[in-house]
């Protein structure tokens, strides 16, 4: 395919540009502007390469001429004592003629050295002419070329071989360039190693860093210890609606100001647990104390936990805050307690706190939140056994009676079943919303 010029490329259609790119081995599925740019770049590159090849061929031809002249001068000096010389073009070797092979037509005898010199001049002129304008070789020219120097053809390659030679000569040059550009890794590593600090320097630097860090921490802690706000803690009675454990913790956090990282971490963990408890057990918090009358009166004591515990997920240290801790504060009213100290006391581990002593009289004097059962209780064990036996017998009788007449569901049974399904569905949705039940994938 003929490669068009740069001016012709602008006038070509997009489809023609694509076909041209495909034929040249370039990417064709580009936008028109990018494709045109790529083709122009390729054509320029090819033209530059062609010019370089021409320059190389000219330089190689001139070098070949020089070598020819040198070789011819050497051969003249060598062949003056010899009587005759033969040269076969195909084998490219000087052959000493035997008496048997003298009958062949390929040998030419030269007696005088002057004739030999004239022959060589003519040959060199013919070679230059053929190098510039290639023409079909005749038999007469072949005969003339046969009487050339001995090793000239072997040393000087033909036109076909010249391009190969030039390409090969250019390759080692490229290799040399790459060898120069490759970095000396040994030197690089040595320089990098020298830049690195020694172990002693590293330890000194670390010590300085730690000393600076400790001094900064000391400076931060000094204003906290000195400038604590000396305010008496107000006596807390029964918990109001607004004073939930979460709100207490928030107020403590506000009054604290900048506290140490360890206490902050503990506070964060407590906060998380309190939030999770608030999500899971909303009815058992102190905030819903006013809704006691709305509940059913037949509640068991196991469920009633508003007075004893604050929240399900909080540690025992939090539960103690409401009752026993207030007594200690009122007893030691002379001792000043800053908000910072208060938080540390509140965030003690449940292991360090002692269990609260159960007061029987106080618990009995408290009014019941439910109506106790009046009258006789049913016997627990017997009723259980009898129920099981009765159910078993009834089931057998039922199957005996109705194995030929299948039991049809009544509308009431269907309604009850639907209601039960709705209740289960509602409970499941509420559980998922509160994070009690994991959502099914």
From Swiss-Prot:
Q: Which GO terms describe its molecular function?
A: DNA binding; microtubule binding; RNA binding
User: According to the UniProt record, where is the region Interaction with microtubules?
Assistant: 237-382
- For this entry, the protein name equals Nucleolar and spindle-associated protein 1
The UniProt entry's sequence similarity note says: Belongs to the NUSAP family.
Q: Which PANTHER family match?
A: NUCLEOLAR AND SPINDLE-ASSOCIATED PROTEIN 1
Q: Reproduce the UniProt comment on modification after translation.
A: Ubiquitinated. Ubiquitination by FZR1 may lead to proteasome-dependent degradation of this protein.
Any coiled-coil regions, as ranges? 407-432
Q: Give the main location.
A: cytoplasm
- Which stretch is the leader sequence? none
Relate the assembly described in the record. Answer: Interacts with DNA and microtubules. Microtubule bundling is inhibited by IPO7, KPNA2 and KPNB1 while association with DNA is also inhibited by IPO7 and KPNA2.
Keyword terms of this UniProt record = Acetylation, Cell cycle, Cell division, Chromosome, Coiled coil, Cytoplasm, Cytoskeleton, DNA-binding, Microtubule, Mitosis, Nucleus, Phosphoprotein, Ubl conjugation
Q: Which organism is it from?
A: Homo sapiens (Human)
State which gene encodes it. NUSAP1
Domain remark from Swiss-Prot or TrEMBL:
The KEN box is required for the FZR1-dependent degradation of this protein subsequent to ubiquitination.
Q: Where in the cell is it found?
A: Cytoplasm; Nucleus, Nucleolus; Cytoplasm, Cytoskeleton, Spindle; Chromosome
N6-acetyllysine modification, residue list: 411
Function comment = Microtubule-associated protein with the capacity to bundle and stabilize microtubules. May associate with chromosomes and promote the organization of mitotic spindle microtubules around them.
Q: Which GO terms describe its cellular component?
A: chromosome; cytoplasm; microtubule; mitotic spindle; nucleolus
């Amino acid at each position: 395919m003929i490669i068009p010029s740069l001016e012709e490329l602008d006038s070509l259609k997009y489809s023609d540009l694509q076909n041209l790119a495909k034929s040249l081995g370039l990417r064709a599925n580009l936008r028109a502007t990018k494709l045109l740019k790529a083709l122009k770049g390729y054509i320029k590159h090819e033209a530059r390469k062609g010019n370089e090849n021409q320059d190389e061929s000219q330089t190689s031809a001139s070098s070949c001429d020089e070598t020819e002249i040198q070789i011819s001068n050497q051969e003249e000096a060598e062949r003056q004592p010899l009587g005759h010389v033969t040269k076969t073009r195909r084998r490219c070797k000087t052959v000493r003629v035997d008496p048997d092979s003298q009958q062949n037509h390929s040998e030419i005898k030269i007696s005088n050295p002057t004739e030999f010199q004239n022959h060589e001049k003519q040959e060199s002129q013919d070679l230059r002419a053929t190098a510039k304008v290639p023409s079909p070789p005749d038999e007469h020219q072949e005969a003339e070329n046969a009487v050339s120097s001995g090793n000239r053809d072997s040393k000087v390659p033909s036109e076909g071989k010249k391009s190969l030679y030039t390409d090969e000569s250019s390759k080692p040059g490229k290799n040399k360039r790459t060898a120069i550009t490759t970095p000396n890794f040994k030197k690089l590593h040595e320089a990098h190693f020298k830049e690195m600090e020694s172990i002693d320097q590293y330890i000194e630097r670390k010590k300085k860093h730690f000393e600076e860090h400790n001094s900064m921490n000391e400076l931060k802690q000094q204003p906290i210890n000195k400038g604590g706000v000396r305010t008496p803690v107000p006596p807390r009675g029964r918990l109001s609606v607004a004073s939930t454990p979460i709100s207490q913790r928030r107020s403590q956090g506000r009054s604290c100001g900048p506290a140490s990282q360890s206490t902050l971490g503990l506070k964060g963990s407590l906060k998380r647990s309190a939030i999770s408890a608030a999500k899971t057990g909303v009815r058992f918090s102190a905030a819903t104390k006013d809704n006691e009358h709305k509940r059913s009166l037949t509640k068991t004591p196991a469920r009633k936990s508003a007075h004893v515990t604050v929240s399900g997920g909080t540690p025992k240290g939090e539960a103690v805050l409401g009752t026993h801790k207030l007594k200690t504060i009122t007893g030691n009213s002379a001792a000043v307690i800053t908000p910072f100290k208060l938080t540390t006391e509140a965030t003690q581990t449940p292991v360090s706190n002692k269990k609260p002593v159960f007061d029987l009289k106080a618990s009995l004097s408290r009014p019941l939140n439910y109506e106790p059962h009046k009258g006789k209780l049913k016997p627990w064990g017997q009723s259980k056994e009898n129920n099981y036996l009765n159910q078993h017998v009834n089931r057998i009788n039922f199957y005996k009676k109705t194995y030929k007449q299948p039991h049809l569901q009544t509308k009431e049974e269907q309604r009850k079943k639907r209601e039960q399904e709705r209740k289960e569905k509602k409970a499941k949705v509420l559980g998922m919303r509160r994070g009690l039940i994991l959502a099914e994938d």
